Regions:
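Short, acidic, small-residue-rich periplasmic hinge/interaction motif at the N-terminus
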Residues: 52-56, 61-68, 93-102, 109-156
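Outer-membrane beta-barrel signature, preferentially recognizing the C-terminal barrel domain
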Residues: 681-794, 841-852, 858-860, 892-894
């Protein structure tokens, strides 16, 4: 299916979006009509010109030309030329700027004027303007908090395969690679692939999946041709950006068709190289088209497509005991699935304890379950921009559409296949305000859980009970009982041989069609009665061998079935409806720069019961917030005070207040040095999954803690051991409800210690952070220095705990009667394997804090060579003894060093860049696996050449060119090398 076919099939404005904004649209269109009919003809001033480098005389593409104090303007083309009209009579001033160059101003005095501008290379990058730190333009030097930035010039020179990959070279930034197409960005610790503590805003829209509550990297984000700027705020920012702006925010802003018109195209190809996967080609291509029809109307469209092969995950170490091999009867390989299904053979078949122990089914390697490891991403972006007057009022209608395949590692490894997400936005904005509303709508497509794919492929061949019965019969030697007269001699293996017993159970030797009359008679006479069966009746198949027609048929059936008892597909059509607004009183109030704003959001969870407990229809809940900020300068504009206050309320929780206060002071005659200090609080609401998930993940059942969720969730029937049935009213099965995990469970640590105790924890509530930060920025000629240090103190930190729920009995042993019972029923349940692990969502009472620092130096050496180095330190403290069942999951190296070296013009039109990243070892904790991650050094490099006559940039590069494979978390595929060549026209 082509991307454009998908667009035709799936592109629509959801009817629910129409219901929400139809009144706004009617009023807005009326306003537009009135404004249009009431508009007058303004005088037009035509301006043309060129922008060149002062040192080399080379044209500068992508330079920003704006009317000072307004958003009207344009950018230079590949040859440094520009032309635009301004509905304003002279005189007025133009500002010309670009990252890496000192901005300049030019006075326009005539109605038809041509100008020539030269830009000097900036001594440092500290004069660059950012918006995200305070929601208002300000120099990086004066920003009240730490901020990182990237724009088109740095995208051109990045040594990484994509601009998004290049974010890893910024100081303080961690990029955890889930797969080739899914990179998870984080700052300041507590990283996961499901990074709900880090926000990503694309043109003001939260790019998170409604069901997952986190973004999938740039899988469904922005094409690099359309990127104008990327800004990253490390740390808490809840005071301005609300819930979940907890660890940081990434802002991606696209180019305006008013300022960046024309057609741009890129093509990229190369190989990914990995020991497990070999060498595989990838392709990446895109086009951006933008046209300014008039001073009032402009439009753009961009498309990009990437296809490649994922990194193969081939870690076959035993999950619980890494030293054990497949010879272990209870083997559970990390990247092998289906072997999680295991039973205590002694309890089930009433053999003496220690005779057979626990045995697992034979699993399948992940490489056989990922349908070719296809990595794919297709993105489209359409926007209409209308400026009804010659002022700065602008109306934007924007649609972003993405479709892709990737792999996500959560509690299990999920093949995100044919995932589709769309966002539609209507925005009205001006110099001092914006109002926007958007909808995020997703479709899980053909996504499935690889673990349950394996489990149910096994079950489609032979049921669990039949497989374990066959293993027992072979291992115990029951088939070789002399009473059967040796009729099973030709098929039964020698007893006590685990490998032979497993092979016997994987076969279909006891299928009725495979038996002769003597064997079938023996089974009916001796084995069936002993097992409580009325007769022997088997229609099993042998284990399906990967690559066989039987395996393919079973795989296709299981991955298209959304019932986890028989399939592995998960469905999702969840949505987010969001509106937010901001108004800056800067032009109306002289005393200070004051702005106010607010937001409202509604979640509509719709997984048809495959992820959430939405069995009877979508689950809906809302949250809203409002904020105010004041900024004031004192002492000859050297001292800047910023104070912010925000209130947020989520439907299921009490409201939260988030204050932020910061002070910065500029030193030196040219204000080129700046000291800053800030205090702020942040909070994070429990995610949709924290509250409403109801999912059997194989190793554990995940149940969210919303009160109405606890009673909705119920397990499939669970088999009770023969011994346990006397405590379960004689019933052979039991169903557990979600509430049991929170009210009648054992803590895992107590069971592991041999002293089972009832777990004790509360329902999940918002977590909070109090953050302190100090920093110093300075420019010394061609050298810039940026240092910061922070300390974060957390309260009610949200996390998971694993508890064990007994099939019968009370976990506090209150039902124990010593005179009639040998032991408490719940304790007997533990001894017989009659329990189920649950993962619950709660808050830790432990004291948790983190602290760290970053230092970055950038300068010019040997003339025009750029050199940069930065160091990041990160550490956390957690009182594990106060909460032994809690895993904090800091998942961040204590030390990181990053170095860059390059030159954009080594000789005429030739440039290069090299990035080196070193990361210390660290411990990774997650619901999938806990393990150490080794230290690593990664080298990326690129060489580029510009051909002005063709308006083209050619690049050749490589990522991890050292070739030593590594991973950022255990369980994922090891990252090999990636080599590429690219051709960009009109970048």
């Amino acid at each position: 299916m082509t991307f454009f076919t998908i667009i035709r099939k799936k592109l629509y404005f959801a009817s629910t979006l129409t219901n929400i904004i139809k009144d706004i649209m009617k009023k807005l269109l009326s306003i537009i009509f009135v404004l249009f009919m009431g508009s007058v003809m303004f005088a037009q001033t035509s301006i043309t010109g060129t922008v060149k480098e002062a040192k080399t005389g080379e044209p500068i593409p992508g330079a920003n030309i704006k009317v000072l104090g307004k958003s009207i303007g344009t950018t230079t083309d590949f040859d440094g030329n520009f032309s635009f009209k301004v509905a304003q009579n002279p005189p007025f001033t133009l500002e010309i700027s670009l990252i890496g160059y000192a901005s300049t101003k030019v006075e326009i005095t005539k109605s038809d004027q041509r100008i020539s501008v030269v830009l000097d290379e900036a001594a440092t990058a500290l004069d660059e303007v950012v918006v995200s730190a305070s929601r208002t333009p300000e120099r990086i030097l004066e920003s009240p908090v730490t901020i990182e930035r990237m724009d088109v010039r740095e995208i051109k020179n990045t040594s990484s395969p994509t601009f998004y990959d290049g974010l890893e070279n910024l100081k303080g930034v961690d990029v955890n690679t889930n797969s080739l197409t899914f990179k998870s960005i984080n700052t300041r610790g507590f990283a996961t692939f499901a990074n709900t503590r880090f926000m990503q805003l694309v043109d003001g829209m939260d790019n998170s999946s409604p069901a997952l509550n986190f973004n999938l990297g740039n899988l469904l984000g922005m094409s690099e041709l359309d990127v104008s700027t990327v800004e990253l705020l490390p740390g808490a920012s809840s005071a301005l950006y609300g819930a979940n702006a907890f660890n940081g925010i990434l802002f991606m802003t696209s180019k305006s068709p008013f300022e960046s018109a024309g057609v741009s195209v890129y093509g990229k190809t190369g190989i990914t190289s990995q020991k497990a996967a070999g060498d595989n080609q990838f392709v990446d291509a895109g086009i951006r088209m933008a046209y300014k029809f008039s001073d009032k109307f402009a439009a753009k469209a961009s498309f990009s497509y990437m296809k490649g092969t994922e990194w193969y995950a081939t870690d076959y170490e035993d999950y619980e005991n890494p030293g054990l091999t497949r010879a272990n009867p209870n083997y559970d390989g990390l990247n092998i699935y289906g072997d999680e299904v295991s039973i205590n053979m002694d309890a089930t078949f009433r053999t003496p304890a220690g005779t057979l122990g626990t045995v697992s089914r034979t699993g399948y390697n992940e490489v056989d379950l990922m349908d070719g490891y296809n990595a794919e991403s297709a993105k489209a972006d359409f926007a209409l921009h209308y400026r009804p007057f010659a002022n700065d009022l602008e109306i934007v209608l924007n649609s972003k559409i993405g479709n892709g395949n990737t792999i996500y590692q959560g509690a299990n490894r999920y093949n995100i296949n044919n995932f589709f997400m769309q966002q539609h936005k209507l925005e009205i904005k001006g110099n001092n305000f914006f109002v926007r509303g958007y909808i995020t709508d997703e479709d899980a497509g053909d996504s499935y859980d690889s673990r349950f794919a394996a489990i149910n492929i096994n079950r489609s061949a032979k049921s669990d009970s039949n497989w374990f019965t066959d293993y027992f019969l072979a291992m115990s030697g029951a088939l070789l009982n002399p009473a059967f007269g040796g009729v099973f001699g030709p098929i039964a293996p020698a007893p006590g041989n685990h490998t032979a017993a497993r092979a016997f159970a994987d076969g279909n030797f006891l299928n009725n069609a495979s038996l002769n009359p003597f064997q079938l008679g023996a089974l009916n006479a001796g084995i069936a009665p002993a097992l409580g069966l009325p007769s022997w009746n088997r229609t099993d198949a042998a284990r399906y061998v990967p690559g066989s027609e039987g395996f393919k048929a079973a795989f296709d059936k299981v991955t298209s079935d959304a019932n986890l008892a028989t399939g592995s597909k998960f469905q999702d059509a969840s949505k987010i409806y969001h509106t937010d607004a901001n108004y800056n009183f800067g032009d109306a109030i002289d005393f200070a720069d004051i702005q106010v704003g607010g937001s409202w959001r509604q979640y509509s969870l719709n997984s048809s019961g495959t992820i959430f407990t939405d069995y009877d229809g979508p689950i809906k809940y809302e949250e809203y917030g409002a904020y105010m900020q004041m900024q004031k300068k004192f002492v000859d504009d050297r001292l800047k005070f910023t104070g912010s206050l925000r209130y947020d309320k989520a439907q299921n929780f009490d409201g939260n207040v988030s204050p932020r206060v910061s002070l910065s002071y500029s030193l030196g005659e040219g204000k080129t040095r700046n000291l800053r200090a800030s205090f702020q609080t942040g909070f994070r609401n429990p995610t949709t999954q924290d509250q409403y998930i109801g999912l059997d993940a194989g190793r554990a059942i995940l149940v969210g803690s919303a009160p109405d969720n606890l009673d909705r969730y119920s397990t499939n029937p669970l088999t009770v051991s023969p011994t346990g049935r006397m405590f379960n009213g004689g019933a052979s099965t039991v169903e557990l409800v979600g509430r049991a995990a929170y009210e009648n469970s054992f803590s895992l640590s107590s069971v592991m210690a041999g002293a089972p105790a009832k777990s004790n924890f509360g329902l999940v509530k918002p977590e909070k952070v109090t953050a302190y930060e100090v920093g110093y920025r300075a420019g010394f000629g061609r050298l810039s220095l940026d240092m910061s240090a922070y300390y974060n103190q957390y309260e009610d930190f949200i996390g998971n705990k694993t508890v064990l729920v007994p099939y019968y009995g009370k976990a506090d042993f209150s039902d124990f009667n010593p005179s009639t019972m040998p032991a408490p029923p719940a304790a007997i349940a533990l001894s017989q394997g009659d329990y189920k692990p649950f993962q619950v969502y709660t808050n830790s009472p432990a004291d948790i804090s983190s602290y760290g620092a970053t230092v970055g130096v950038d300068t010019k050496v040997m003339g025009n060579y750029s050199f940069g180095v930065n160091y990041t330190y990160a550490k956390f403290e957690f009182d594990q003894d106060s909460d032994p069942d809690y895993e904090a999951g800091f998942n961040t190296p204590e030390h990181k060093i990053k170095v860059s070296f390059g030159n954009t013009d080594v000789i005429e039109n030739l440039g290069f860049n090299v990035n080196v990243r070193w990361s210390d070892e660290y411990f990774w904790e997650s619901t999938f696996v806990n393990a150490m991650v080794d230290a690593r050094t990664v080298v990326d490099a690129q060489v580029n050449y510009t051909v002005h006559k063709w308006k083209s940039l050619f690049k050749i590069g490589g990522a991890n060119i050292g070739g030593k494979e590594y991973y950022s978390a255990p369980g994922v595929g090891k990252i090999g090398s990636q080599y590429f060549v690219s051709w960009t026209i009109n970048p």
